Amino acid sequence: MVIVGGGTAGWMTAAYLKTAFGDRLSITVVESSRIGTIGVGEATFSDIQHFFQFLNLREQDWMPACNATYKLGIRFENWRHVGHHFYQPFEQIRPVYGFPLTDWWLHDAPTDRFDTDCFVMPNLCEAGRSPRHLDGTLADEDFVEEGDELANRTMSEHQGKSQFPYAYHFEAALLAKFLTGYAVDRGVEHVVDDVLDVRLDQRGWIEHVVTAEHGEIHGDLFVDCTGFRGLLLNKALGVPFVSYQDTLPNDSAVALQVPLDMQRRGIVPNTTATAREAGWIWTIPLFGRVGTGYVYAKDYLSPEEAERTLREFVGPAAADVEANHIRMRIGRSQESWRNNCVAIGLSSGFVEPLESTGIFFIHHAIEQLVKHFPAADWNPKSRDMYNSAVAHVMDGIREFLVIHYRGAARADNQYWRDTKTRPLPDGLAERIECWQTQLPDTETIYPYYHGLPPYSYMCILMGGGAIRTPASAALALTDQGAAQKEFAAVRDRAAQLRDTLPSHYEYLARMRGLDV
């Protein structure tokens, strides 16, 4: 196997496949020293636990090396209106008499905050707490760390069985560097060189790549991790790109890496997505700095205006920080696997990082490649099933992102008004009609695996405020006592954890052996 391109996609692929197949599969990574990585995807899904468990990596092994922090969820600011915020946590919704607690909240809300009333994790985010006690035990006592269960299940197989209570933020470049060492130590060949050409055989399959200093590099299976260039899949093999721009117009970003004194400031355990005039700003807390960026649509805002807005948002700490302007290719390749070439990462597809899906797309693609790994006869059905799984995930995430905008009540300028009138992906209008009658469930969300459970949809709809759902009529005829006890249980558990958990900074500092 030849992986063209390093970065997070290339080295996650190399490390995972080497762990899966050992010496039975020869892996070469060809990586240019001149081409930088995009590095937008610094936040993750909680399902990333499967990746590290599969590689048998403990948090203390890799987190300090990658300036990693915990992520208990996403805080959305200004999506309903300026000054309003809500959380989308990693926490399964509690049921009462078969109805989600959010439904009971619609019937008789204890306060005006569905997130802190129905979930524990948003309370810990607002208190700046670690998800682990100082002895390493998880705050979520209902979750059993499953060890081999996580390592031996794919993300799609695990969904719905339990919810790991957090994900991570990390520096993508540092994770790639860490995984480079991990993979090379286990026998992956690392070739630092520029690929000058891709040569095809008479069938149109890739025969070899031509490099500047190492000549021809041959392989049976080629993995395209060349980013938005799509050097192998799109350029050499001519696979078309399917744009999502008709429904997701944000196509640009400007990013800053801002050094900060985290001991003084503290570290919030969540990603923040702050809605702005022509898009939104991400804030990702790392150990020692904050990654931040403005995702916007160039039809509404110039790069200069975007950078100025971002610097004003960050404040004086951004004064001497160099800005990185990124042109994003939003959509997916029509096929992510053609002939003997599989694209993973940005060359396969990308959407704006509103739900931290960049790393998730990579991880899912790797799992599916192992699941559908080609035999000697290159059965086309394996390829077709892989392409279907990857397309469903990306199309499902596309739909979920559209809901963020269609479901946000904010409409204070042309950009936000236009989010309510753009065309919807096929089937979404009917689903929205269902959600105006009842909250999303497994029967009414996007029907194929895409990494997101119904409670995530509930949070976006209830937080955004534009698509209103009434409480189920049955609740008026049902005893209210059990629901009130459940609200009290959430409140009590949140208070207990606020009082007993260390701060996020303290836990991470102690992991690094620092004095606090």
UniProtKB/Swiss-Prot annotation:
<dbReference type="InterPro" id="IPR006905">
    <property type="entry name" value="Flavin_halogenase"/>
</dbReference>
<keyword id="KW-0285">Flavoprotein</keyword>
<keyword id="KW-0274">FAD</keyword>
<feature type="active site">
    <location>
        <position position="71"/>
    </location>
</feature>
<feature type="binding site">
    <location>
        <position position="359"/>
    </location>
    <ligand>
        <name>FAD</name>
    </ligand>
</feature>
<comment type="similarity">
    <text>Belongs to the flavin-dependent halogenase family. Bacterial tryptophan halogenase subfamily.</text>
</comment>
<feature type="binding site">
    <location>
        <position position="8"/>
    </location>
    <ligand>
        <name>FAD</name>
    </ligand>
</feature>
<comment type="function">
    <text>Involved in the biosynthesis of kutznerides, actinomycete-derived antifungal and antimicrobial cyclic hexadepsipeptides. Together with KtzQ, catalyzes the regiospecific dichlorination of L-tryptophan (L-Trp) to produce 6,7-dichloro-L-tryptophan. KtzR catalyzes the chlorination of 7-chloro-L-tryptophan at C6 position to yield 6,7-dichloro-L-tryptophan. Can also use L-Trp as substrate and form 6-chloro-L-tryptophan, but has a 120-fold preference for 7-chloro-L-tryptophan over L-Trp. Cannot use piperazic acid or gamma,delta-dehydropiperazic acid.</text>
</comment>
<feature type="binding site">
    <location>
        <position position="357"/>
    </location>
    <ligand>
        <name>chloride</name>
    </ligand>
</feature>
<feature type="binding site">
    <location>
        <position position="195"/>
    </location>
    <ligand>
        <name>FAD</name>
    </ligand>
</feature>
<feature type="binding site">
    <location>
        <position position="6"/>
    </location>
    <ligand>
        <name>FAD</name>
    </ligand>
</feature>
<dbReference type="GO" id="GO:0004497">
    <property type="term" value="F:monooxygenase activity"/>
</dbReference>
<dbReference type="GO" id="GO:0000166">
    <property type="term" value="F:nucleotide binding"/>
</dbReference>
<dbReference type="InterPro" id="IPR036188">
    <property type="entry name" value="FAD/NAD-bd_sf"/>
</dbReference>
<keyword id="KW-0547">Nucleotide-binding</keyword>
<protein>
    <recommendedName>
        <fullName>7-chloro-L-tryptophan 6-halogenase KtzR</fullName>
        <ecNumber>1.14.19.60</ecNumber>
    </recommendedName>
</protein>
<dbReference type="InterPro" id="IPR050816">
    <property type="entry name" value="Flavin-dep_Halogenase_NPB"/>
</dbReference>
<feature type="binding site">
    <location>
        <position position="9"/>
    </location>
    <ligand>
        <name>FAD</name>
    </ligand>
</feature>
<dbReference type="Pfam" id="PF04820">
    <property type="entry name" value="Trp_halogenase"/>
</dbReference>
<feature type="binding site">
    <location>
        <position position="358"/>
    </location>
    <ligand>
        <name>chloride</name>
    </ligand>
</feature>
<feature type="binding site">
    <location>
        <position position="43"/>
    </location>
    <ligand>
        <name>FAD</name>
    </ligand>
</feature>
<keyword id="KW-0560">Oxidoreductase</keyword>
<feature type="binding site">
    <location>
        <position position="42"/>
    </location>
    <ligand>
        <name>FAD</name>
    </ligand>
</feature>
<dbReference type="InterPro" id="IPR033856">
    <property type="entry name" value="Trp_halogen"/>
</dbReference>
<feature type="site" description="Important for activity">
    <location>
        <position position="355"/>
    </location>
</feature>
